[in-house]
């Protein structure tokens, strides 16, 4: 399977309480070639949908009524298997440095502020998925015993 095909086959979970934001994210992702997109309009269902869908990438809005987006970010991050973490991209209208620091400290791999540039958004999504796929292959190679430090140049 080609690298681009593998990236486009990735499962993407989008969590946002705003239907317009879900529609925009799904439309941009579809235009970029992704077809396995699950949207979650009710953040209270996010954990259940995450466990059932087993995404390769999560796009998470932080500012949702009735739920602490940071707590959800932390919980999603803790659900990921330590040797196979699912990257989480935070989508937020909060441009403060405090919000960015807090999200990164809780495990977000990227932060995109709304409104976002669709071209940049597509590149960031592809980069995170490609990184996840590469780390997964590295992990599998390590389990198979094909990755060792012996290939390193002598220092």
Where are the predicted features?
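The feature encodes the CheY-like receiver
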Residues: 39, 65-66, 70, 92, ...
């Amino acid at each position: 399977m080609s690298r681009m095909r593998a990236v486009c086959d990735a499962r993407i979970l989008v969590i946002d309480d705003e239907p317009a934001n879900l529609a925009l994210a799904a439309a941009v992702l579809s235009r970029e070639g992704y077809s396995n997109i699950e949207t979650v309009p009710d953040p209270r269902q996010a954990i259940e949908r995450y466990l059932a869908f087993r995404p390769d990438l999560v796009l998470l809005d932080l500012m949702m009524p009735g739920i602490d987006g940071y707590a959800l970010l932390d919980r999603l991050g803790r659900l990921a298997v330590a040797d196979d973490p699912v990257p989480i991209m935070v989508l937020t209208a909060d441009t403060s440095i405090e919000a960015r620091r807090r999200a990164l400290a809780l495990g977000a791999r990227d932060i995109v502020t709304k409104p976002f540039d669709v071209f940049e958004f597509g590149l960031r999504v592809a980069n995170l998925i490609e990184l996840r796929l590469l780390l997964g292959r590295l992990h599998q190679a390590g389990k198979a015993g094909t990755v060792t430090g012996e290939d390193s140049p002598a220092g």
